[in-house]
Structures are given as structure tokens and as C-alpha cells.
A protein has these predicted regions:
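Strongly charged, low-complexity linkers/loops
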Residues: 331-342, 346, 355-425
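Extended, non-catalytic structural segments that build the interaction scaffolds
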Residues: 256-263, 270, 300-307, 341-353
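Structural motif
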Residues: 280, 303-312, 352-353, 410-414
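Short, amphipathic C-terminal "tail helix"
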Residues: 413-446
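Basic, nucleic-acid-interacting segments
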Residues: 1-266, 283, 304-308
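Short, structured loop/turn "capping" segments at alpha-beta junctions
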Residues: 206, 323-327, 354-356, 372
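Core structural elements
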Residues: 159-171, 276-298, 309-327, 339-341, ...
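Amphipathic alpha-helical segments in well-ordered regions
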Residues: 17, 21, 199, 302, ...
Length: 446
């Protein structure tokens, strides 16, 4: 906050987080690094300098692989994005513009200093991204990492994860990059993609019309779906970096590095690979399951309890996911334990209940918990799989509906659905669907 006499102290937790994230992005961890003062005058920085790292960051030369799914074919392509550095610094304040929902129309600005001085990690990426889609996926993969590592919840809407982008264009065949423009104020992954795509088109159009691109900082306006000029962009020399005199250099010993390495869990990319190779899941399903660490752990617990991985995947990514979305819950907040989901899936596989009955029980199990088997027995929902019992019901229906039988035998095979529906109605949905269809086919064709 810039109070006279206040001295900075390094938060040990941020150093551990920086090193763990550095390992996760395959970076080189510096055995020695230091802090520097970054000088600039702006309302969100009360002491007019920011404690950051300049020439000796904690992590350098990393890389992160992203997966790009083709929306039409579903095919997944992988691309490696280089990471220049990861460094520690303190956060600045937040400007709040009043009088309009846009900066360009606001009457005045307020400064929220609540996050000032809070430690953060900043990642600088190599110019390997070529589209808004790639950048958005890259940001999402970084969010997965910080969530798995327990560094942050990664919520962009709350500012836990923030992203600035630099965009430049160049003619096909030209090696030198064009003038870069920085874009700020993107609080969602879709905003990142849209802002980049808009800025690419803006710069191309400007160059084709003979205009020049100036180095500046622009703001993404969500309502206007456009970028607007904010201020000219400073160069590194404008910040007048010099070593932070109030913080000593940082040393990371080999022993400490090994300890932090041992604390790193299985990361999203490793989980995805294991799910595909060992559990036989598709790349898409593996990706959906590993997007949230809690969901992945829930899935693995259900599989460990003896359930078929592919069947559990369907329930977790479809029915349970829909319930969570509709009720704005996380998977840790539901009463349905993974072992009970495994029990429910196994009841379907054994033919004890139908998938339809299982879906009807799901909401109650999610809300109240309990045993799936006991609930089935209590409600009398055990599937009827006795051919003799089903044949008796089907014979009665055929005898009572001769006109429908005649329609079927004259070629109107869709009439079969009528008989299936009647069997389900008489058995309160407990008839084995597969066996019911087989027996009806046999009776009607006979």
C-alpha cells in the first residue's frame, strides 16, 4: 500500500507454488533468483513500483502441450507451446470504472486496493499461439494445472486467473513479427478467444488499408465485442528495473526441490494418457473427466469399487454432470458416494434393474445417498427377467389387440413400439427391455 517504513516479506507458500508449477510446465528451476523493482506510475500502484522478477526469474524455458479438438470430426491434435519464464511478483489494485459499463463512456474510476501486495505468479509464453482457439485452450490447460496443484481455484470471473495477450500479424512468408498490441480485460476463456480473433482481423484490415499498427495497450469491451485503445505500451526500459534492496536473493536447495517434486500429484495430461491407454476411454471422455480434479478422483473411486470404467464415464459425464450444472453444485457436494454409483452401475450390468429405472433412482441417491441395492429392493424395482413371466404378459396383450397384430404382420412394424410400451406399463417399467423386445418379435412374427 506504500505506507512509510513498511518492508516486504517473501511468502514461503508462493515460492513452493512457483517451483511446483515450474516443474509441471517442464521448466528449469533456478537454484538462485532474485526480486526487482518495476517502476511505473499508475493509479492501481500506490507506491509507484511493483516488486517483481526481471533478469533472474524462478523458472525459465518451460513448455506445455495443449490438445485441440476438431469440432466436426472430434479428432484431437496436440501442440506444444513454449514458456519463456515464470516469475513471482506482487499484485496491484483493481480499477473500477463508474458511470458506464464501458471504459470509453465512464465518468470516473475507483481503485480497489484489497488485492494490493498479494503474491501472484506470472507466466510469459513464447509466440507459438496462432489463433484465439489455441490461446483459450492454453489458458484452460494452465487453469487445470493450478487447480490440480492446489495453487488457485483459477476462476477468471473472480480474478484468480488473469490473462493479457499480445497480438501481432505479419504477411505470409515474412519472418519478422509485426508490431504487437497488448489486450487486457478478458474475464473468460470465450472472451480471450473472441478478443484475439477480433484483434487479428482489426490489424489485418488496418495494414491492408495502408495504416500502421502502433504498440499500445487495448481493452476488450465485452458488450461491444471489440477492442478499444487504452494507453501507449511501455517497453522494458521504461520500467527502470533495479534489484529489490529489501528482499534477499532466493536459494532453492536440491533437497527442497526433491521434496516439492514428491508433493506433485498426477497431472491432467498424465491422467488423460492413463485413462486412454489403461481404461480404454476415448480422448474426449478422458479430457472431460480430467478437467476437474475432484471429478477425476470421484471417477477413479467408482472404478476402484469394481464398476466398468466406460459405463461409469457415461454416468459421470452425462447424468451426474447435468444434475450438477442444473443445481450449481460440485461433485463433492452430492450425497451419492462413488462406491454407490459403482453399485448402481453393477446392478444394471447384472440385469437387476434397467437403465431407465437407474436414471429414476439417480436423483434420490444424489440428494439423500444410501445404498442403491437397498433402494431398489425397498421400492420393488428389481427387473423382471423371467421369460415365462414376460411371455404371459405379452400373450395377454396380443390376444387383447388383434388389430395391432394384423397391422404389424401387414408391414407396419412400428406397431411393435405399442406392445413394448404396454409391457412396460403393466410392469411399471421393470421389464427387461432387451428380453422384452426379443419376445415381442418372436410372438408377433409367429
Amino acid at each position: 500500500m506504500g505506507y512509510p517504513g513498511v518492508l516486504p516479506v517473501l511468502n514461503e507458500a508462493v515460492l513452493a507454488s512457483a517451483v511446483k508449477l515450474g516443474i509441471a510446465i517442464n521448466g528449469k528451476i533456478a537454484s538462485e533468483s532474485k526480486f526487482d523493482r518495476k517502476q511505473y506510475f499508475y493509479p492501481d500502484l500506490p507506491k509507484n513500483y511493483q516488486i517483481s522478477q526481471y533478469d533472474l526469474p524462478i523458472v525459465q524455458h518451460g513448455a506445455l502441450e495443449i490438445e485441440l479438438a476438431d469440432k466436426k470430426t472430434g479428432e484431437v491434435q496436440r501442440k506444444t507451446i513454449g514458456i519463456t519464464r515464470l516469475h513471482m511478483e506482487e499484485d496491484a489494485g483493481k480499477l473500477v470504472h463508474a458511470g458506464s459499463d464501458r471504459l470509453s463512456g465512464s465518468t470516473h474510476s475507483l481503485v480497489d486496493f484489497n488485492r494490493t501486495g498479494v503474491p501472484l505468479l506470472e507466466i510469459v509464453s513464447e509466440p507459438d499461439l496462432r489463433s484465439g482457439q489455441e490461446a483459450a485452450e492454453y489458458a484452460q490447460e494452465l487453469r487445470r494445472l493450478v487447480r490440480y496443484l492446489g495453487i488457485s481455484d483459477g476462476n477468471m470471473q473472480e480474478g484468480s486467473l488473469r490473462c493479457d495477450v499480445n497480438v501481432s500479424v505479419r504477411p505470409v512468408g515474412q519472418e519478422k513479427f509485426g508490431t504487437k498490441v497488448e489486450i487486457k480485460n478478458m474475464n473468460s476463456f470465450s472472451a480471450i478467444q473472441k478478443a484475439i480473433d477480433y484483434e487479428i482481423e482489426r490489424q489485418i484490415e488496418a495494414l491492408e488499408n495502408g495504416a500502421k499498427i502502433v504498440q499500445e495497450t487495448r481493452l476488450w469491451e465485452e458488450n461491444g465485442q471489440r477492442t478499444v485503445s487504452m494507453r501507449s505500451k511501455e517497453g522494458s526500459s521504461d520500467y527502470r528495473y533495479f534489484p529489490e534492496p529489501d528482499l534477499p536473493p532466493i536459494e532453492v536447495s536440491a533437497e527442497q526441490l526433491e521434496q516439492w517434486k514428491a508433493e506433485i500429484p498426477e497431472l491432467p495430461a498424465q491422467k488423460r494418457s492413463r485413462y486412454e491407454t489403461q481404461l480404454g476411454l476415448s480422448a474426449y471422455d478422458a479430457r472431460v473427466l480430467t478437467d476437474d480434479r475432484e471429478v477425476a478422483e470421484y471417477f477413479e473411486a467408482a472404478v476402484a469399487a469394481g464398476a466398468n470404467p466406460k459405463l461409469v464415464t457415461n454416468w459421470v459425464t452425462q447424468d451426474i454432470a447435468a444434475y450438477l450444472n442444473n443445481n450449481k453444485l460440485t461433485i463433492s457436494e452430492i450425497a451419492l458416494k462413488p462406491e454407490v454409483l459403482a453399485e448402481l452401475v453393477n446392478l444394471i450390468e447384472k440385469g437387476t434393474i434397467s437403465g431407465k429405472i437407474a436414471k429414476e433412482l439417480l436423483s434420490e441417491l444424489i440428494a439423500k445417498g444410501g445404498s442403491a441395492k437397498e433402494l431398489v429392493e425397498k421400492k420393488g424395482l428389481i427387473q423382471i427377467s423371467d421369460p415365462a413371466e414376460l411371455e404371459k404378459i405379452i400373450d395377454e396383450l396380443i390376444a387383447a389387440n388383434p388389430k395391432e397384430v394384423e397391422k404389424f404382420r401387414s408391414g407396419k412394424t412400428n406397431v411393435k413400439g405399442f406392445f413394448v410400451g404396454q409391457v412396460m406399463k403393466k410392469t411399471s417399467g421393470r421389464a427387461d427391455p432387451k428380453l422384452t423386445n426379443q419376445l415381442i418379435d418372436k410372438k408377433l412374427q409367429g
